[in-house]
Regions:
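Residue-level preference for non-acidic, small/hydrophobic
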Residues: 57, 76, 107-110, 114, ...
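Catalytic loop of the DD-peptidase/beta-lactamase superfamily, centered on the K-T-G motif
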Residues: 30-82, 266-389
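Hydrophobic (often cysteine-bearing) scaffold residues that line and stabilize catalytic clefts
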Residues: 49, 53, 102, 106, ...
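Short active-site loop at a secondary-structure junction
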Residues: 90-151, 193-202, 277, 364
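A mature extracytoplasmic/lumenal domain signature
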Residues: 74, 85, 104-106, 205, ...
Length: 389
């Protein structure tokens, strides 16, 4: 089987959207082989014909991913489909209830907390980072007094992404990073542009936002996400693992990558997620992500004013993203349907989750290998099929 994740270190670093490195107690390398389509047995509580969706899922699998999960919720009714394998060694089939690393979908959780804090008048989105974290950004062409919370949320701050630096080693499985280290790595590079004068994806900005949440609340960003989102919504399969390399439980796929054009996929399931920090450390399931985006897009997680701010977008210049809001991006499909969500590429896993405004129709897709820099968008045709009018 052609491996989708035949990538160089450079392209891996560019692909990372809040990703983490892994901790591997026992690294195994397995040869990728043709995988069998496996549909999970699940509750199909709607009469809608999803033949086209199934075909789009199967087509995505043929791009070279070991396995894929797709699950949707529409009007309170759920549907799901799994294909391929969760484990290349044992040929264990993929299942729709498996947990996976969600990478930069973490950013939507971080943004939700900050918008809730804004709605509580505990901060202003146009506050400077210097106001809350004085001295954390100094020199090298940066002016912390001009960089705002809003700009970090929508990636217009100009802060360089630490994922582009060689010091952020996405191939080193055991390394532990602190948030301060990641920020230092990012700020060692000059700004991409003056604050508010461009758009450039910055994981560094979201790590700073995690530090800021702790400054404002006295609690870690993980505690705030748990208290404000995970517990109230009863997202029982959603975790912030911190420095733990383990995906909790046994119901999860193994994650794979093929570095530097290798024809064999390396098992990188056990992974120290500290390199992701508040930009991308989280673990979840398709059901939990659908529930989160349903609540978010229906306005149940924040005040109307804050949701309007979240959905106020700026151009990105990137076709695959479209326009970016605050921790969420807008995709306009050829069918005319507007989707709000986020993707997350994380060594071993790739994810998309989102839905329509109002939250009545959501979709979560996960792959147990990260897409390569030059591969087609693995989600585009699934989105078109699922959200066709």
């Amino acid at each position: 089987m052609k491996t989708c994740s035949q990538i160089t270190f450079a392209s891996l670093a560019l692909l990372i959207a809040g990703s983490s490195l892994l901790y591997t107690t026992q690294t195994s390398i397995v040869k990728a082989e043709p995988t069998q389509i496996v549909s999970s047995s699940l509750q199909t509580s709607t009469q809608r014909d999803r033949t086209a969706v199934k075909q789009a899922i199967r087509d995505t699998l043929q791009l070279g991913f070991p396995g894929i999960i797709a699950k949707t919720s529409e009007g309170g009714k759920t549907w799901g489909y799994a294909a391929g394998v969760a484990d290349l060694s044992t040929k264990k089939p993929m299942k729709t209830n498996f947990r996976f690393r969600i990478g930069s979908v973490t950013k939507t959780f971080i943004a939700t907390v900050l918008l809730q804090l804004a709605g509580e008048n505990r901060l202003n989105l146009d506050d400077s980072i210097e106001k809350w974290l004085p001295g954390i950004i100094q020199g090298n062409g940066y002016d912390a007094k001009q960089i705002t919370i809003r700009q970090m949320l929508n990636h217009t701050s100009g802060i360089a992404d630490y994922g582009r630096a060689k010091e952020a080693d996405f191939t080193h499985a055991k390394r532990l990073y602190t948030a301060e280290e990641l920020v230092k790595i990012g700020l060692s590079m000059p700004p991409d542009f003056a604050p508010g004068k461009g758009w450039s994806y910055s994981n560094t900005g979201y790590v700073l936002l995690g530090i800021l949440i702790e400054k404002v609340t006295g609690n870690s960003y993980a505690e705030e996400i748990e208290n404000r989102i995970i517990e109230p919504l009863e997202l029982s399969n959603t975790f912030l693992p911190g420095n733990s390399s383990v995906i909790p439980g046994t119901k999860h796929a193994r994650g794979y990558e093929g570095y530097d054009g290798a024809s064999e996929l390396k098992d990188i399931t056990y992974f120290n997620p500290s390199i992701g920090s508040s930009a991308g450390e989280m673990i979840s399931t398709a059901d939990d992500l659908n529930k989160f985006f349903s609540y978010l897009l229906s306005g149940k997680l924040m005040k109307e004013r804050q949701l309007k701010q979240m959905l106020t977008t700026v151009p990105t210049g990137r076709a695959e993203i479209g326009r970016y809001g605050l921790g969420i991006y807008e995709t306009k499909l050829q069918s005319g349907v507007q989707i709000w969500g986020h993707s997350g590429d994380f060594p071993g896993f790739s994810t998309f989750a989102g839905g329509t405004l109002g939250g009545k129709h959501t979709l979560a897709v996960s792959l147990n290998s990260m897409r390569s820099a030059n591969s087609p968008d693995p989600y585009k045709n699934i989105l078109l099929a699922e959200f066709s009018k």
